[in-house]
Design a protein with these regions (language model features):
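Bacterial N-terminal signal peptides
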Residues: 1-6
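Active-site-proximal N-terminal segment of extracellular/periplasmic enzymes that hydrolyze or transfer
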Residues: 9-51, 60, 178, 184
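Extracytoplasmic/secreted proteins, especially bacterial periplasmic and envelope-associated proteins
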Residues: 16, 38, 42-45, 99, ...
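Non-transmembrane alpha-helical segments in soluble domains
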Residues: 22, 30, 43-48, 71, ...
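Active-site-proximal cap/lid insertion segments
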Residues: 24-33, 37, 163-167, 175-250
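Short, structured active-site-proximal loop/turn typified by the sulfatase FGly-forming signature C/S-X-P-X-R
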Residues: 34-67, 73-74, 78, 105-111
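A short beta-strand-to-alpha-helix junction
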Residues: 35-40, 57-62, 87-97, 202, ...
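Catalytic-site neighborhoods of secreted/periplasmic enzymes
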Residues: 69-171, 175-197
């Protein structure tokens, strides 16, 4: 998920840009796209004051290929970043391919990036600051180091925007969450009883029960039957899945 804000400054012709990137965010929980109840009031406020994209797709349903496509404007078969593998299998983006950061920098912008990278070189041109983990606890849901890093990312971005440079800038605040829902599955693998939470459990989607697996696309069959996270959830009941959805939405 991504939100783009433009902050025009009267003293300069070039506007400033803030890009907020949320890993694994689905529009099905975003109020601006009709989710009821909405899990994203701040995003909804931004959307109400600007433009929303109603028909947008990622370049690939994997982190590194998708991010390389986003920051370069090219599809994975053009960037050659095709998986989440290490560099000896998955080469980084060639220097010959322009990136969003290199184009903005070449045109007089300060390009800064805070937070998650996982970009295979596609953030070239941005000055990156690694976030510092800020531990916290949640009384109802497990949290880990990736979530702690998001606190540091937010604080770094706010500090930068509170004291912006004189030249025009493009700033990216790149968050780990809600991708950490993958870790929730591992924390609750197998048969288990979930602890009660303070809010009502959400209902499961209408397509939760699959009547005919053979009618589903092969990639979906693979994810549902072979992926390690689905193996960890193989013995979950419907109540476990409702807690899982609640964890994602919170």
């Amino acid at each position: 998920g991504m939100a783009l804000c433009s902050f025009p400054v009267m003293a300069q012709q070039s506007p400033n840009f803030l890009i907020i990137q949320c890993d694994h965010l689905t529009q099905r929980v975003v109020g601006a796209y009709g989710a009821d109840p909405s899990c994203t009031p701040p995003i909804d406020r931004i959307a109400s004051q600007g433009v929303t994209f109603a028909n947008a797709y990622v370049g690939c349903p994997l982190s590194q290929p998708s991010r390389a496509a986003l920051w370069s404007g090219l599809m994975p078969h053009q960037t050659n970043v095709r998986s989440n593998s290490a560099e000896h299998i998955n080469p980084p983006l060639p220097d010959s391919i322009p990136t969003l950061g290199s184009l903005f920098t070449a045109n007089g912008y300060e390009a800064v990036h805070f937070g998650k990278t996982h970009d295979m070189g596609s953030l070239r041109g941005f000055r990156h600051k690694e976030p510092v983990a800020k531990p916290f606890t949640d009384p109802e849901f497990p949290v880990n180091n990736d979530s702690f890093l998001d606190v540091g990312t937010c604080e770094d971005a706010v500090a930068y925007l509170s004291n912006p440079p004189q030249e025009p800038f493009i700033c990216i605040a790149d968050f780990q969450n809600p991708h950490n829902i993958c870790g929730y599955v591992g924390e609750n693998k197998g048969e288990h009883i979930d602890s009660p939470i303070s809010t009502p459990l959400p209902l499961l989607p209408e397509n939760f029960e699959v009547e005919n697996w053979e009618k589903l696309p092969l990639p979906i069959q693979y994810i549902c039957c072979s992926h390690r996270r689905m193996m960890q959830a193989a013995h979950w009941n419907e109540d476990n899945y409702r807690h899982y959805v609640a964890a994602f939405q919170h």
